[in-house]
Amino acid sequence: MERWSSLRHHGLVHPASPGGWGAVHPTVIMSSFKQADHKLLMIPGPIEVSDDVLLANAHPSMAHVSPDFVPVFGESLEMLRKVADAPSSQPFIISGSGTLGWDLAAVNLRETDDDVLVLTTGYFGDSFAECIATYGAHPTQVVAPVGSRPSESEIEIALKQKKYKAVTITHVDTSTGILMDVEAVTKIVKRVSPDTLVILDGVCSVGSEEIHMDAWGIDYLLFASQKGIGIPPGLSLSLASPRAMKTFESRTTRRARFNTCWT
């Protein structure tokens, strides 16, 4: 009772409000909310989430087809463009894991029997190649020894061997911690094989490492909500360049999936 008396005295609760004496001013909730004590989560992801972010998730459910939802979703798409420094891109927000972005790339940006160059620095590069093969494309891997990354000369030689529809890069492979020099790789691709799409797996890097999607010439960037973005798991996030969208629109392969197709 003493707490409520103090809140009433400072004008932070009001008997005439819809919630009666229990309607607490939002600033009080924001300042007083604290998540329960727990063991510190020290893994690459999901990461620790701030009290403010958790409280924001306490918002009531909204109808996804309501007028109120439209500006919220639109603002979220614009924020993705800012995070990736990609004002010309088409953002996507989909319920799912970060690796769902692999499927989105394989479904929407390849034709049957396309060749794809996969730069591998660990487990997730290997798995990306496996995903690509599942959808009927042919991955060729440039595999670096554990703890290192493919050299620029190895990448250039591989690009000259055949015509690749796309090259995939794991920006940071969680299994090894190796950081790829994405800007350097995109410069090689532009010089040696300019028609090849650049696909970047940024699940472990977006929000933590420098990325300039438009300036570097990245065609498709995939990531997730639970690492550098700093919110709970559950969202597969991605952006496609105008060139990637044109590639999608000109595909001739029959749509093989429903929920992962951009149409």
PLM features: residue spans?
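N-terminal "arm"/small-domain region of PLP-dependent enzymes with the aminotransferase-like
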Residues: 28-67
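Active-site C-terminal subdomain of aminotransferase-like
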Residues: 48-49, 226-263
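Conserved N-terminal alpha-helix of the aminotransferase class I/II PLP-enzyme fold
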Residues: 56-104, 123, 127-133
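Conserved PLP-anchoring active-site segment centered on the Schiff-base-forming lysine
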Residues: 110-126
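Conserved active-site segment immediately N-terminal to the catalytic lysine
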Residues: 214-226
